[in-house]
Regions:
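N-terminal Rossmann-like dinucleotide-binding module
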Residues: 1-47
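Conserved acidic residues
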Residues: 30, 64-66
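Short, conserved SAM-binding/catalytic segment
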Residues: 42-50, 107-112
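Short acidic low-complexity segments
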Residues: 51-64
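Beta-strand-loop-alpha-helix segment that lines the small-molecule cofactor/substrate pocket
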Residues: 66-70, 78-124
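Aromatic "clamp/platform" in nucleotide-sugar-dependent glycosyltransferases that forms part
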Residues: 73
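Oxidoreductase and adenylate-handling cofactor-binding alpha/beta cores
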Residues: 127-129
Length: 129
């Protein structure tokens, strides 16, 4: 059975993730939330079979998602992580940075203590010679 990805955000980095998921035999982009009409249109070209949700609440409540990719604008990551944490915990890959406001450090610490599934922060371009 293919792993069903839920994608939050499909700008430039989100579209790169969609392309990469398409290359994995046992994975599929199952659901997408992208509020920007232009980015949503691009995402539909890359993942035409995906369900496109019109709100964060709707995608988060989709019980068929096996894992999450949070690829939204940086300042939204913390709020979206907390929203995803309200439903059964599934693995999450969140693009860097994890948070943009030092005052959110305590929120991150609380999230990581309570969240029972793996959480990764993407850093694939940390070193490019």
């Amino acid at each position: 059975m293919k792993k069903r990805y839920g994608i939050i955000g499909c700008g430039m980095m989100g579209q790169e993730h969609l392309r990469n998921i398409n290359l994995i035999d046992d994975a599929l982009t199952y659901a997408v939330y992208e509020p920007n009409p232009n980015m949503r249109k691009m995402a539909k070209l890359l993942a035409p079979e995906a369900k496109f949700h019109d709100s964060l609440d709707k995608i988060v409540s989709d019980e068929n998602i096996d894992c999450w990719l949070i690829v939204s604008p940086n300042h939204l990551h913390m709020d979206q992580l907390e929203q995803v944490a309200r439903v059964p915990h599934k693995p999450i890959l969140v693009e860097k940075p994890l948070f943009t406001n030092i005052n959110h450090l305590e929120r991150v610490e609380k999230f990581l203590v309570k969240y029972t599934a793996p959480v990764w922060v993407a850093m694939e371009y940390r070193y490019m010679p």
